[in-house]
Each structure stands twice: as C-alpha cells, then as structure tokens.
C-alpha cells in the first residue's frame, strides 16, 4: 500500500487523504484559512477524522495540519499544544477514548517567512491555527455518531478554568441530558443536577443561572419564574443549542462542544466490528 500511496501523492490530494482516514465517519473533514502579513499571504490547511471516542485527549481522532511557513519544532509544538487545548481537547461525543490518536502540525517551509523571527507573525499564526482547528473540531462533533444536534456548553463565572471544565463535561457526558437533547426536551432538572454533582467545592446552586439560548431556564436553585415551556421548546427544536451556565463566583469561562445521544448511536456501536 505504501508504494501506491507514494505514487499517488499530489498537491491537490487533500480530499483523497481525508477520505482515506475515515472509520465510522460519514463524511471527510477539511478546512483552510489564510491571513496576510507584511503584504504576504500565509496559508494553513488541515484534515481530520473522528466521529466517536473523541474525549479525553482526542482518543480515536486524527488531524493533520500543514502551513507554508518556516518554524522550529519547539515553537511548532508550543503553538500546536495551545491550539489543541482550545479545539480538539474541548470536544466530546460520548466521553469514551482509546489508545489511538494523533495531531500533527507540519511547517513545509515553502514560504521564506519564519515564525521564530517575527513575534507579530507568531500571534497571527496562533490565532489562525486555533480558528482552523476549531473548525475541524466542530466538524467532528457535527458528524458525531448518530448525532442530530450540535451543542455548545459555555460555563462562565468560574473561579478557575478547571471548575468551569468540570461543570461543562459533567453536562456534556450526562446520558440523561444528551437523551433529553435528542428528544428536544428542555429538562432543566437534569442540567442543574449535573452542575451540582460536577464536584465544584462550595458551589451555591441558589446563585447560579442556566440559559438555553437566550431563554433563562434556572435561577434561585430552580426553574426560573420567567421561563415558559413554549419558549424553551422553540429553542430545543433547533439543530444547534447553546447551554450557558453562570456560576457567579469568578471571571473564568470555558466552552465545550458535544452532541445529543440518539438511537443511531447505539445502533452504530452495536453493529460495529473492528
């Protein structure tokens, strides 16, 4: 297979490569971004694979990103780590993982622009790399096994990044919440329960608020007085749902992206044989 792959190398072979790494994915995932610096155009392109077993630490996910800049391995690794932590390490489909994952950043050096010699270029490149990887990460979630909804979970007002992520992942990994999302059920009790058992020390559930979209769902430890089932249902019927939890105990915020849990998820994984 390797000689055949080598002979098939082509500068326009991104889609073939993206197709070649799929497993339970239903479609290839690729993205490109460009930005300008000193009158020059810098390009980044990437492909990714993943549909289930995505978190933690990327699990069965694969991602390959290339850019035409020059860069030392040390700086490239630092930039990659930063971008991964705000993209691929902020998504989850089922909370499951495996021993197989890779994410690579390749600096081809086709351009004479060198990241190590220009701090302004480093900042621009870091932003573009994170943007590209978030686009690929979101594509993985949208193609999650059996997924029918793309769910953003934003936790703000935290005392630390760690506790914001604790709450976000407690919500994202709850089978009861994920099945409620599949049913378009604005079940505030399940969300509040997950926030409560996330393990945040000295959390005051009477102070926090929970929104779905722009609709206030929870305040004062229970269902908000202003909440109406019709408003909640209208939001839940959408394909994209935003859950926002304000812990009201600090200035930190984090966002995690996930899916609902459908009948098809069970079918895909019951039928799959490796």
Task: Specify the residue positions occupied by each region the protein language model found.
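A structural signal for small-residue-enriched, beta-sheet-centric alpha/beta enzyme cores
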Residues: 1-274
